[in-house]
Each structure stands twice: as C-alpha cells, then as structure tokens.
C-alpha cells in the first residue's frame, strides 16, 4: 500500500535493495559479526530473556555459588554437625534478577531529486552503513546500562587511578591487575578489556600491546609485539593477558589533560542478551513526493549477570538506563565479573 499524502521530511533511494531475499537476516548477521562485544564473548545470547510469548520484562533465575563446607566423619553415633552421626544436607540459594526490554526503531527517506543531484544512490549508501549504525546504537545502550549499574549497585567494583601523578594516572599493567584484584580470586575470570582510543593508542605507543591475528586457531596463533608491526586489519590486541576492545563511545568526562576515561574489564558472557523481536525491515514508496522510505525496528534487552532492573516502568530510554536508582544487585558484587577502571591519557 502506498504511503499517505505526505512528504517524508529529513530524508536524503532504492527500496528494491531491501526486497532482496534474506536481506534482514544478512544485516542482523553482519551486526553481530561487527560487534566487538559479541565477538569477544562479552555479550552472549540467552533465549530465556526473549519473552517471546509477550511481556515487558523477564525474570532471570540464577544460583549463588554455595560457601564451601565439610564435616568431620567418625565411627560413632554423635559425629557431624547434626550431632547424630550423619551428614547434614545443605542447600544452594537461588536468586532472581529482572531484565527490562527495550523497543527501538529508525527510518530513512530519500527522494529522486537527491539522487539526481548527487549522481549516486543515497539509499544504497544508507543501507551500506546500517550495520554500523545499529551497532553504534547497541553500544550506546550497553554503555548507558553499565553507567546505571555502576552508579550505586556496582560502585565498589570501581578502581580510579586518574588522580595519580608521574604516569600513575595512566593505564598500566599494575592498574589493570589492581582492578582485577577487586574481585579477589575471581579476578582471573576477567578476560576482556574495553577502552577508549586515546587510552588504546597510549598503550600502543608504549609498546605494551601484543597483537594476534583473529584468523588463527588458538593452538597456532602468531603474536607480534613492538606496536603491531606487520599486523593486518584482522589484528586483535591483548594487554595484561586480556583481549582489548577499542571503542570511541567509551565514557569520557572532562576535556584536555583533565579528561578521565572509563574502561571496563569483563568476564565472558557477563552481559546477556534477549531478543523479543528480531530485526524487522520495511519499505514503502510515496508516489506523490517521489520518495523511498525504509524503516527498521527491533526489541531486545541486555542483562548484566547478578543485577536487577528495579524501576517501575519498562522500555527505558538510554537516559533512564543510565540512572543509578533503577538498578540493584541480587548477587554479591564479587560474583559479578565486571570492573570499572578510570584513568587519564596523555593523548587527550
């Protein structure tokens, strides 16, 4: 059905591009393949969070690791904690957090005059950028979620070295190890380090990054050091034994030499994703304005293990996700494998 009598404003063409069979599936696959947070294992799919039967939030059950215990056994009728000659059964405690779902969409429109004027196809260009656009939107949502969780609930999982001097205010192996120690023995579970480019390139300038090609099998990996000489665009950086993600959307507060950068240390699968409505694509043609329009929508939610969405409402904006009053914990904070690390960079 044609669009109603109106002009799609704000647009820049080629609705046939999205009628190609399986285009939407290809686009969603590309989104996941281009997501460093997905490829590194930080984000994992959890079908229990999908709420495919309907709903605005999901309950996320989980078990709290039991405290180790044992009893001395003897050859009499009074041994054990029971005092009656038998072992006392213990229980494992379950906890249930809540995850909220979000519904997002975006749309582009272009007219034939813009195509004629530019000599190119603006809609084709738009479609080429879509996976990058959706990925940036997802990253912005994830970082807002992290800001909210670390505001109060996980504040104790933060290490701030930005007040240091003489180089101590920059990211170092010592700072990263200190951040890992916040979780005690569970600090060894942290395997991915996400940082801003200004932090990343400082490490690279110091020769502190080690690179490995992502195309090699783990048992046959080839490593280079000294700034990544000879490394192709498939390079994967490691620092202090952790895989590095570089993203310019990582939080920065302040400017210039006073800028403070927030990095995150993640354990595998600590961010779980539910998908209530997979990416849906639709297109239309307005014959009165000679415009093509394409729209996208998706419904999903991120959940950080051990946390809980405590707000009354659902389908939050990124601003609401960043609100520290909307989150609580259902696990002890040391059981949640995420640590926040704040530092400065000489490349600000």
Outline where the language-model segments fall:
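A generic "binding-loop/recognition-motif" signal
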Residues: 24, 104, 199
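Sequence/fold signature of self-assembling virion shell proteins
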Residues: 2-40, 166-171, 205-348
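Assembly/oligomerization interface modules of large self-assembling protein complexes
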Residues: 33-104
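Extended, solvent-exposed, turn-rich assembly/linker loops in the middle of proteins
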Residues: 151-229
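Long, contiguous amphipathic alpha-helices that act as assembly "spine/axial" helices in icosahedral shell
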Residues: 60-61, 91-154, 186-194, 279, ...
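Short, well-ordered loop/turn elements at secondary-structure boundaries
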Residues: 55, 187-189, 238-240
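Short, solvent-exposed loop/turn elements at domain surfaces
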Residues: 67-72, 202, 254, 304
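Alpha-helical scaffold segments that mediate packing/assembly in large oligomeric complexes
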Residues: 110-185, 325-348
């Amino acid at each position: 059905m044609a669009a109603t009598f109106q002009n799609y404003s704000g647009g820049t063409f080629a609705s046939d591009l999205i009628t190609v069979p399986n285009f939407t599936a290809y686009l969603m696959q590309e989104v996941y393949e281009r997501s460093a947070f997905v490829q590194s294992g930080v984000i994992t799919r959890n079908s229990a969070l999908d709420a495919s039967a309907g709903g605005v939030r999901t309950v996320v059950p989980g078990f709290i690791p039991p405290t180790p215990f044992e009893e001395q056994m003897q050859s009499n009728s009074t041994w054990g904690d029971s005092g009656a000659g038998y072992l006392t059964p213990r229980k494992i405690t379950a906890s249930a957090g809540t995850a909220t779902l979000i519904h997002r969409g975006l749309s582009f429109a272009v007219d034939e005059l813009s195509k004629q004027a530019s000599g190119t196809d603006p809609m084709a260009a738009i479609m080429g950028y879509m996976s990058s656009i959706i990925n940036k939107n997802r990253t912005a949502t994830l970082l807002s979620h992290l800001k909210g969780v670390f505001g109060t609930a996980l504040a104790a999982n933060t290490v701030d070295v930005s007040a240091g001097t003489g180089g101590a205010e920059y990211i170092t192996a010592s700072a990263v190890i200190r951040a890992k120690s916040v979780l005690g023995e569970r600090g060894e579970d942290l395997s991915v380090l996400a940082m801003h480019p200004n932090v990343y390139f400082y490490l690279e300038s110091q020769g502190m990054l080690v690179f490995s090609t992502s195309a090699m099998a783990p048992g046959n990996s080839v490593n280079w050091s000294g700034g990544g000489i000879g490394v192709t665009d498939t390079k994967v950086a490691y620092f202090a034994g952790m895989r590095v993600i570089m993203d310019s959307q990582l939080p920065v507060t302040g400017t210039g030499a006073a800028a403070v950068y927030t990095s995150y240390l993640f354990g595998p699968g600590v961010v779980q994703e539910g998908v209530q409505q997979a990416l849906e694509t639709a297109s239309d043609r307005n014959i009165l304005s000679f415009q093509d329009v394409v729209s996208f929508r998706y419904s999903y939610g991120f959940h950080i293990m051990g946390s809980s969405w405590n707000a009354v409402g659902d389908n939050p904006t990124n601003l609401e996700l960043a609100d520290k009053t909307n989150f609580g914990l259902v696990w002890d904070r040391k059981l949640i494998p995420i640590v926040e690390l704040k530092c400065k960079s000489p490349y600000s």
